[in-house]
Amino acid sequence: HGTSRRQRQMCIRDSFENLPHGIIINGSTGIGKKILAKEIANNILLNFDKDNNLKHQVLFDKNTHPDFYLLDKDKIGVNDISRRDKWDEEKGFRDVVTFLTMTPSISKNKVVLIMNADLMNNAAQNALLKSLEEPAPYSYIIMTTNRPKALNQTIYSRCRQININNLSVIETNHWLEKVGVTDYNAMDFPSFATPFNILDDIQNDNHNSYKEFILLMNDFMFSKIDQSQAIKLFTDIDINFIGKINFLVEFLKIILASKLTDNQL
C-alpha cells in the first residue's frame, strides 16, 4: 500500500540464509510500515515457501500464530521486553525475550514485531540488546520507528535498516485512486500527509480541515477577517493542537516558497 511494491519485493527476495535477525523499518506515520513488517514476518514464518502449510497463513491472518508475537503499545517498558515472571498469557505476563527463548511451536522460526519501537525507554532497549547480540538461529525481531535515530546506536548496529520515503504527489494520487478515493487528491492535504493519514482523515470526516485552515489564514492575511475572528476560527478547527502547529508550519513553508519564487499564493 503506502510502501512501494519494489521495496517489499526487495526485502522478501533476500535469501533466507542472509536475512538478519534484527530489522528496523523507518518511515513516517501512515506510510505503511506495519504492512511491510507483517509481510516480512509472514514470509519468515512460512520459511519463504509460499506453498507451505496453509494453516500458518490462516493463523497469521487471524493474529493467533503461536510463533508470532506483536507488541503494539503506547508505552514500552522493560517488563514488555524482559520480565522475571513466568510467561502467562491469561495473566498478561508476556515479554519479547521469553517468547524468543521458547522453541518454535509449528513454524521453523519465531518472529517478534515491535511497533513504534522508538517508544521503548532505555531500560527496555538495553533488555532487548542481548536478543539482538546473541540471537537463537530461529528468532527474528522486526521493529518499526516513526523517527530516524530514535533508538540507541548499539541497536542500529545489530539490525538492517529499511527506510521508507514519503510518496510524491503523483504516487499518492495513484494510491488513492487504487483504494477507490476519487473525490480528493494529495493537494487537498498538507505535504507531510501520508497515504493512511489521508485515508483516516477522510474516514473520520476531517478531510476539509487543512483547506479550512488555508482559507482562514488567507482571509486573515488579506484583512478579510480580524485577529479575534481568526483566533476563534482557528480554535474551532477540529484537530488537535499538534496538528494545528503542523498546519502553521506548512503554511509558513508555502509563504516562504511563494516569496522565493515571487508567486502569488
Name each model-derived stretch.
Residues 5-9, 13-123:
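Clamp-loader machinery-focused feature within the broader ASCE/P-loop NTPase space
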Residues 5-9, 13-43, 49-61, 137-139, ...:
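Charged, glycine-rich active-site and insertion segments that engage polyanionic ligands
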Residues 98, 130, 153, 157:
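Conserved adenine-binding aromatic site and its adjacent loop/helix in ATP-hydrolyzing domains
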Residues 99-103, 131, 175-179:
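A generic secondary-structure signal
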Residues 101, 126-143:
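Conserved catalytic/switch belt of AAA+ P-loop NTPases
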Residues 115-116, 144-146:
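Short His-Asn-centered micro-motif
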